[in-house]
Structures are given as structure tokens and as C-alpha cells.
Amino acid sequence: MGILGLSKLIADLAPQAIRESEIKNFFGRKVAIDASMCLYQFLIAVRSEGAQLATVNGDPTSHLMGMFYRTIRLLDNGIKPVYVFDGKPPDLKSGELAKRAERREEAEKALKAATDAGDDAGIEKFNRRLVRVTKEHANEAKELLTLMGVPYVDAPCEAEAQCAALVKAGKVYATATEDMDALTFGSTKLLRYLTYSEARKMPVKEFSYEKLLEGLSINSREFIDLCILLGCDYCESIKGIGPKRAIELINNYRDIETILDNLDSSKYTVPENWNYKVARELFIEPEVANADNIDLKWVEPDEEGLVKFLCGDRQFSEERVRNGAKKLMKSKQAQTQVRLDSFFKTLPSTPNATNAAKRKAEEAKKSANNKKAKTSGGGGGRGRRPK
């Protein structure tokens, strides 16, 4: 689910935090990609040009086709992807998972009704709702990535949290996902639509964590509370509080505890046994692997291994697979080109460092004004009188 209404809220109140770019503008960047989100996109995507979507046994292969060709496209544009796979969901997510199971049952009933009625549009619509990424899909994708020479990371828990940890550690530039909660986990950059097909012609949307905090006039802790009020995967939200009211409450009271002390109970009903504190801690201290211990390496592809894996039962065109392998090799050789800013190490930003820089700038400005005042006011010269 991500965070309900967050994207629009940022667009309305902190538009400077969003930048649209072409994919080529991320040349030389390392990006952590939410693998499950990608696989879901690939599984529901409508394929054209006579592409094979299943094995001889009828098992889907669209997730492998998508992973293969989209990854090649990223590498063609000088982007180094690392895919991050979900681990076990946190216990607090069980409520959201139960809701998804209910929606799945409803979709199954609706699909049967659409099938009985011969409603082709309805059949397609509800079939898409029933798609889910399985462990087998993920394992096949990992095997494919290994053969392509592209690294992946198994997150102990949420992939978005692990992506954010890689960004904060300086291992990668950004998190690529459609789920906005990567920002709630503290990813300093979020890229949306990066793995969309070229045919959709969607510019990549880059969200800046620092600029959104500045635009919303809140700090990182307050941003987490805002996201909980908007609606997240870990607890219920307060019915009747939409995005506009949520940011007003955060700006007025700064945290959920104070909001609850001042909330009009005749207008809003707080969920019983509301686990907002546990949800907050999940965002502040998520279960992630230590990013410093993760070694990311992009190596040469195994062309023969790719042919063996994708052709045969999976029915990929050998010619296209070999052409793809050659593109991978070419991209690997071109990786010697680097961005100019890669020569300068960027240290992870911290609130203390930012505040110190601001204080230093203010002190320098104050010192300059004092000198100016002394120069213009001293000795009876023709300088301007101090105001």
C-alpha cells in the first residue's frame, strides 16, 4: 500500500521536492530497486510483439522477460541496478495482509461473475488483481540476475527499508519503487517509474527527502508521524483525517501524542488499541541487514548460462537472449565511464551536520555585517551611516 496520499501532498505543498527526468540523466548512478514491485509490474504487464509469456507447461515467464529486458535497458543507460528482495513481513503488517486476502477473495468472486457473463474487460481487470509474486518467481529472478552479473540483496524484512539503508550508507544513490514509504524509512532519494517500459513514455520522478521536509516545514520524526496519520501498512489511521488535515495537525502539534490530547473526539474516532507507537519504531529502527557489510559487484554475464536458463522450456528466443547478453557485456565495458561527482565522496547527511552548517553560515554572515558596520561607521569617512 505504501503511504496513502503522500505523493499528492508533496506535489501540492512541496513541489520543489519533485523533479522529472529522463532515464539517461541517471547515468553512472547506482540504484537499489524494490524487486517485488518490479516482478509484480512484469507479471501484470500486457506483452506484445508475439512474445512468449509461459513455459511449455504453462508457467508464467513474463516476470523473467521483464527482469531481463528492463535490466538491460537500465544498464544501457549507464545505471547500475541492485535488486532488493523482501524477507518476512513484520508482525504488525498482519492486519494489512489480512485485508489483501479479503480483497483477493472478492476479486475471485468478481472474476467468476465476469467469466460467466463473458465480460472480457472484467476478466482482464480481475485477473490482474489476483496476480501475486510468489517465492518461486523471486527465486527464478535471483537466478536470472546472477547469470546477468547483476547483484541482489535478500532483505531480512521489508525491501523498501533495506533500500533506504543502502542509500543512507552511501552504497547507492536512490531507491527505485512505487511505494512512497521508502521516504518514511529515510531514503534520501526516491525514484518512481524507473522500471516502467519505454513504450509508456513516463518520465522518472525523483523525490528529495531533504526538500520535502523543508517544504512541509517538519523534521524526520514528524514526517513519520504524518505518514502514520495518512495511512501506512502497519496500523490503522484515524477515520476522517485526510492529507490536508493531517499536515495541519502535525504543523500545529508536532507529534501524535499531542494531537491525541487535542483531538476533537466528537469529530474523529481513534482506533481501539492503536499501535501507532510500534509503527513509528518500525520506521525509525527497521529490521535491515548492515549496509556496510553488503558488497555490491556488477560482473560479466554468463551468456551460455542465460541461453540454457531462458531458452528451451521457457521458450525465449535464443537470438534475442544472445543479443541481450552482448548488450550486457557492452554495458559492463562502458562502466569505466563515471559521473564527475563520483570523484567526490558524499558523506551521509545528518540533522546535526545540517544544523552546524546553518549556524556556521549565520555566524559568517553576522561577522561580515559587523565588519561592514565598523568600516562604514568609523573615522568619520564618507561611508553610509549604520541603520
UniProtKB/Swiss-Prot annotation:
Chief subcellular location: nucleus
Record EC number: 3.1.-.-
Region (Interaction with PCNA): 336-344
Location of region: I-domain: 122-253
Cofactor note text: Binds 2 magnesium ions per subunit. They probably participate in the reaction catalyzed by the enzyme. May bind an additional third magnesium ion after substrate binding.
Region feature (N-domain): 1-104
Domain of life (superkingdom): Eukaryota
Cofactor(s) recorded in Swiss-Prot or TrEMBL: Mg(2+)
GO molecular function: 5'-3' exonuclease activity; 5'-flap endonuclease activity; DNA binding; magnesium ion binding; manganese ion binding; RNA-DNA hybrid ribonuclease activity
Subunit note: Interacts with PCNA. Three molecules of FEN1 bind to one PCNA trimer with each molecule binding to one PCNA monomer. PCNA stimulates the nuclease activity without altering cleavage specificity.
Protein name from the UniProt record: Flap endonuclease 1
Protein source organism: Drosophila yakuba
